[in-house]
Swiss-Prot record:
Major location (coarse): cytoplasm
Gene field: mngB
Catalytic activity: 2-O-(alpha-D-mannosyl)-3-phosphoglycerate + H2O = (2R)-2-O-(alpha-D-mannosyl)-glycerate + phosphate
Pathway(s) the chain acts in: Carbohydrate biosynthesis; 2-(alpha-D-mannosyl)-D-glycerate biosynthesis; 2-(alpha-D-mannosyl)-D-glycerate from GDP-alpha-D-mannose (MPG route): step 2/2
A GO CC annotation given for this chain: cytosol
Residues that, per the record, bind Mg(2+): D8, D10, S169, D204
Xref: HAMAP family: MPGP_rel (MF_00617)
Keyword Metal-binding: yes
Active-site residues (renumbered): D8 (nucleophile)
The name this protein goes by in its record: Mannosyl-3-phosphoglycerate phosphatase
Function: Hydrolyzes mannosyl-3-phosphoglycerate (MPG) to form the osmolyte mannosylglycerate (MG). The enzyme is absolutely specific for MPG.
Record's keyword terms, sorted: Cytoplasm, Hydrolase, Magnesium, Metal-binding
Length: 243
């Protein structure tokens, strides 16, 4: 039996930005035999940082399901995708350049602030992110984050233009027609080729809902409600349930 767990990072695995609190959680999941899949709105660069710090070497999903990064040779069969460094990448979203092209048309009308038109200092202020992590968050490939706006209505304009606007733990994300569930389903199908699987997901926000729909058991940290997810106060509670 292959046991998989899809983990959101922000406010689910890690309360802030420091990886140390997550280390014992990851170790316990490894001891239970889990394949740990990060499924986050964070960029590839950010996730590579946390993967290194937490010693996680499995595939991962970036920017709200926009891309799946599979280490070369991870599966004992060919995976079709784009070769990028040491990964095979399955792209499900659209490039950030296209998103920013649209945001540029709207930023003055609606007072939008996002990564592409903000300084490092502004981003640090908006997010509370440590200065050394800001450049990693700025390495966006498939999405943009809306930090603030002065007028409502921009969401409707973007949706009418074919983009998706998704609420995360703190900010809205603009991306293509991708979500965490579609990406997770693709990985689940790969793992099913290896044998019987048992799948879990843990998240805390609306953008995690599609991920909950494709797994056997889901958990939501906090008070949001989802028909398929069990509410827990923290990821520590999840460990007790899935032992």
């Amino acid at each position: 039996m292959i046991r998989l767990i899809f983990l959101d990072i922000d406010k689910t695995l890690i309360p802030g930005y420091e990886p140390d609190p997550a280390k014992p959680i990851i170790e316990e999941l490894k001891d239970m035999g889990f394949e740990i899949i990060f499924n986050s709105s964070k960029t590839r660069a950010e996730q590579e940082y946390y993967r290194k710090e937490l010693e996680v070497e499995t595939p991962f999903i970036s920017e709200n399901g926009s891309a799946i990064f599979i280490p070369k040779g991870y599966f004992p069969f060919d995976v079709k995708g784009k070769e990028v460094g040491n990964y095979i990448v399955i792209e499900l979203g659209i490039r950030v350049e296209k998103i920013r092209e649209e945001l540029k048309k709207l930023e003055n009308i609606y007072g939008l602030k996002y990564y592409g038109n903000s300084t490092k200092e502004e981003i640090e202020k908006f997010t509370g992110m440590p200065p050394e992590l800001v450049p990693l968050a700025m390495e966006r490939e498939y999405s943009e984050t809306i930090f603030e706006w002065s007028r409502d209505g921009w969401e409707e304009v973007l949706v009418e233009g074919g983009f998706k606007v998704t609420m995360g733990s703190r900010f809205y994300t603009v991306h293509g027609n991708s979500d965490k569930g579609k990406a997770a389903k693709i990985l689940l199908d790969f793992y099913k080729r290896l044998g019987q699987i048992e799948s879990y997901a843990v998240g805390d926000s609306y953008n995690d809902f599609p991920m909950f729909e494709v797994v056997d058991k889901a958990f939501i940290v906090g008070s949001l409600k989802h028909k398929k997810a069990q509410n827990v106060s923290s990821i520590i509670d999840v460990l007790e349930v899935i032992k």
